[in-house]
Amino acid sequence: MFNLIRRSAEWGGKTLVLESGKIARQASGAVMVSYAGTTVLATVVTGKTKEPVDFLPLTVQFVAKSYAVGKIPGGFLKREGKPSDRETLISRLIDRSIRPLFPAGFYDEISIVCNLLSYDTVTPPEVTALVGATAALSISGVPFNGLVVGARVGYLPSEGKYLLNASADEMLCSSLDLFLSGNEDSVLMVESEASELSESQMLGAITFGHQHCQEVINLIKEFSHESGQTPIDFIPHDISSLVSDIESSYKEDFSLAYSNTIKKERVLKLEELRGKVLSEVADKYSAGDVECSDQDIVTALKTFERSLVRSKIIDTSSRIDGRAFDEIRDIEIEVDVLPKAHGSALFTRGNTQALVVTALGTPQDEQIVDDLDGDRRENFLLHYNFPPYAVGESAALRAPGRREIGHGKLAWRAIRYVLPEKSDFPYTIRVVSEITESDGSSSMATVCGASLALMDTGVPIKSPVAGIAMGLIKEDDRFIILSDILGDEDHLGDMDFKVAGTAEGVTALQMDMKISGIDIDIIEKALLQAKDGRMHILSKMNAVIQESRNRIKNHAPRIESIFINKDKIRNVIGSGGKNIRDICEKTGAKIEIIQDGTVMIYAVNNEAVEYAKSMIMDIVTEPEIGKVFEGTVVEIMKFGAFVSFLGGKKGLVHISEIRNEHISSVGSVISLNDKVKVLVIGIDREHIQLSMRRVDQESGEPIDGELYNIRKNSFSDDSCGSTGGSSFKESYNPNSRHGSHEKKRSGGSSRSSRRNSNGPNYYREDLPSSNGFGNNNRSFSNSRNGHDVPRKPRFF
């Protein structure tokens, strides 16, 4: 029933298996790829387009199934829906790797779908998916010029060792995360982020990865040969005579148009000429005997324009705007351009302009990413917006597409390394790049603008980051590398090579090809030329702002973290969240408590942060003998007053500790809700004894000698309101039916000396030793039961 084809090989210490003929047999080509514990089903379907087109309608979709890791999708529908950013980025990696290998003029519709069916969270799924896509193309019959394989490369600088398809844990120690694809002879695509690596280290990683791709290319060759499927013979339509006719009639006009250095004028003139060519050539051929379609004319015109611009550059080293091959366009930089933004910068390079804005948020603003590798929180976001007006087009605004997501991720990679650690700067950082003009290299303008905006915000980045886009014109063995390419040079050239980094090294690298790859020598030259351009741009940036501002804007949110004892977390929260709600309502701050005792305070200004901080510290601070606090009278009794302080702690001010002189009634001196200053003079577990008379109620300072007397343990019974030198110790039980005061002799037993179950007993504190506060846990013999129990501190 099944015509099963199977091939396997060891690659990077793991087993790679290719299978076909069993699943998805209705597709033009289908391959099940297993690499270690990761399995991808790659399918290719091709067919004729409904209408003639002059481009390759290639669609690549990478779909990560939740069941691949045994998960059920979140959300109401509980099924896969809109592609995640990661799925989009992997789809782009595959597309950019294989697109250059289709023959020119082949315009059949091609759909490639890579379903991630099983994922071990260790093996890179993008590597497995690209192998599957290439293998499926090789047995689909689609004309495809060569085989392409991808590899993920890491680097351990301490060992000088490169890693192949390493696990996520291994990559944690890596200073490089690079994905590249290549065929037998050359490199086709690179996407990477790095920790300020040198150009030679980056080149070494590319060489290392390309060498290891050859092992799998040979495996796919064997697999394809066994299938017996050969690509169809594609013979492109011959339009050479049409190209010659256009060149002879319109070369001068197009040469003049392309010599205009002002993009807006150049674009308008070129559009006018193209319309003229399409009309006149169509009329000419319709009157003759030679059949010529509109698609043929468009293709011939593109071929002519490409040849015209490329030959001028490679023959004369003269570019469209008159610059030298390594010359950077004029740069203008402004910072702090938006007064209410937390940070902003306007970066203009020629006719490319990016308005980059930074917003700071709290950790509660972090993006929650639901990923197959596990949910995570992202505190750095970079969004890239490319509206139609940036290139003078009239079109509706749409949601971010693959291009916007890809460009934003490249800039994110370039900036991430220089950001401070979260422990040093706990803010959530969002950077938004609004491309207001575009004539090439808008993603690298985003990198420069993001670095400037972050410094304007006051984010303490390690170093400024700049980016530059390089181009390539290659004809046979002749080639020229262009610095800071224009949009037309990108469109008509052979390579888009973007490098971002600091003065110390590379932080991001991206390369896309329009031809079937380039060798390592060209990549090396491009890297070195890009370094010179990057240093030039950094010098322009440093002339405006060299380092981050030493403080964030006044209207930016404030964040402060404090550490409390883990045992005090429940006190801060309070019963049913009462305390923490009270703090938030009174201060306007947001509070986040982490299990390790870290308390994060978020507020719109410093005053709110300090207020919330003081309220929290009041709750968690333990009262100390000899310390003065401000409190509120919450209850008045015959024998004294209860005062609430330190976020709800209660202590008793005995009637003898309210005033130095005798008072007959507590209520005649103080009232409920009075704000008073109190001195802690004794502590017995939860019971706190306070004094008002020992504190200056105006200044809050202890009265001269009183603090010394407490610490020297020199209180007399007379000063506490007892009789002479009596050995009687007073205790108070507010619920006792025997009255407010009961007396017992030291060491004696009485019914009132025992703690009453109906309410707490308050005892005069034992006199502390001369060098401390005494030991309240000393034991004595209880004559009632004969057991030693902790001695109760006496109540003053």
UniProtKB/Swiss-Prot annotation:
Biased composition, class Low complexity, residue ranges: 717-728, 747-759, 769-784
Binding locations of Mg(2+): D490, D496
Major site of localization recorded for this protein: cytoplasm
MF-aspect GO terms: 3'-5'-RNA exonuclease activity; magnesium ion binding; polyribonucleotide nucleotidyltransferase activity; RNA binding
Membrane-traversing stretches: none
CDD domains: KH-I_PNPase, RNase_PH_PNPase_2
EC number: 2.7.7.8
Uppermost EC category: transferase
Name of the protein described by the UniProt record: Polyribonucleotide nucleotidyltransferase
Organism, scientific name: Ehrlichia chaffeensis (strain ATCC CRL-10679 / Arkansas)
